[in-house]
Amino acid sequence: MSTSETSSYTPDIPSEPVTKTTDTIHIELTPNDLDSLAATRFVRSPSAGATVLFIGTTRDSFNDKAVSSLSYTSYAPLAISTLYKIASNILTKHACTKIAIIHKLGECPIGEESIVIAVSAPHRKAAWLAGEEALEETKDKAEIWKLERFEGGEGVWRANRDGKVGERVDGGIAGLLGRIEVFADTNV
């Protein structure tokens, strides 16, 4: 779903990080600055011969339009669950050692980190493939949205993935509400 919003709209952002961590997976949605070094430390392991770190930063333009700011929001319980499933599947598929996916919520100034993904694996090819897949799956599936504000005040909410301004989220708001309902029913 995508809508134009007034610049005065403020999404509900948790004041503290929301996390889910095991020995091999760390998932975090945070209003704080992202710590790529902490993500790298988490995935470090004596059994890993490779560590891949991806740091996504906010751009100052989208489709030749000047972006003045970005703000991220999510339905945190569902997004944490989705990100954990993504990480778990990637660990198994690529025989990785550990993975961390950390995403910024709230205002994210231009040039600042919005996502950090760290992956370790016994061999570099698996780590490279896993890191890229983690990013693409996160952008495609995680319940995270961004408000892009453009120079001149116009703002557009859209899915947290590359695409066209105003690109509709699959299933629209009805699809999202259905996913939240199913999540709530299975996690009561």
UniProtKB/Swiss-Prot annotation:
- Keyword flag Cytoplasm: yes
Q: Where does the record place the region Disordered?
A: 1-21
Q: Which SUPFAM superfamilies match?
A: Molybdopterin synthase subunit MoaE (SSF54690)
- Which InterPro entries does this one have? MoaE_sf, MOCS2B_euk, Mopterin_biosynth_MoaE
- Which keywords appear in this protein's UniProt record, sorted alphabetically? Cytoplasm, Molybdenum cofactor biosynthesis, Transferase
Q: Which GO terms describe its cellular component?
A: cytosol; molybdopterin synthase complex
The record's similarity note reads:
Belongs to the MoaE family. MOCS2B subfamily.
HAMAP family in the record, alphabetically? MOC2B
Q: What is this protein called?
A: Molybdopterin synthase catalytic subunit
